[in-house]
């Protein structure tokens, strides 16, 4: 559904001290502290019109103020990788969600299949590293 916020789900490769919550979109930290969060998404469009995408972090069900990343694709078949890093202060038991929305059914997150010369690529990635407590 267009113009609707969705949480991305990550179920593999969680680091020590970070686990999946319920639902699986929740990434729960076991220790409080300052965390650097690195996010990337490969976005694509099948429209010749402009398609806009929004991405932002949500902590404990609340959107992080001033954190939205907005990107637009302007042609049919366009693909772009977008990324951002943020530092968040989290308390033990807090959960982080990566949220996204798009304004057209022609826009989508694009996981690329492997080719004869390159490996597959996920549609999105996230890494969460505790800097200090």
Model feature map: region roles:
Residues 88-116:
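Compositionally biased, intrinsically disordered linkers/stalks adjacent to structured regions
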Residues 33-43, 81-85, 93-101:
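Extracellular beta-strand-rich recognition modules
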Residues 1-50, 63, 67-70, 105-133:
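Terminal (often C-terminal
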Residues 54-58, 97:
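Beta-strand signatures of extracellular beta-sandwich domains
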Residues 63-91:
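Glycine-rich strand-loop-strand elements at beta-sheet edges
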């Amino acid at each position: 559904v267009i113009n609707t916020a969705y949480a991305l789900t990550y179920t593999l490769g969680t680091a020590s001290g970070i686990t999946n919550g319920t639902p699986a979109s929740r990434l729960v930290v076991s220790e409080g502290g300052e965390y650097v969060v690195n996010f990337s998404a490969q976005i694509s469009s099948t429209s010749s019109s402009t398609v806009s995408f929004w991405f932002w972090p949500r902590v404990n069900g609340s959107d992080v103020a001033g954190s939205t990343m907005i990107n637009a694709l302007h042609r049919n078949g366009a693909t772009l990788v977008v990324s951002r890093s943020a530092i968040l202060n989290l308390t033990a038991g807090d959960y982080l969600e990566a949220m996204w929305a798009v304004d057209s059914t022609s826009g989508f997150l694009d996981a690329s299949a492997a080719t004869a010369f390159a490996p597959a690529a996920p549609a999105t990635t996230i890494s969460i590293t505790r800097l200090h407590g």
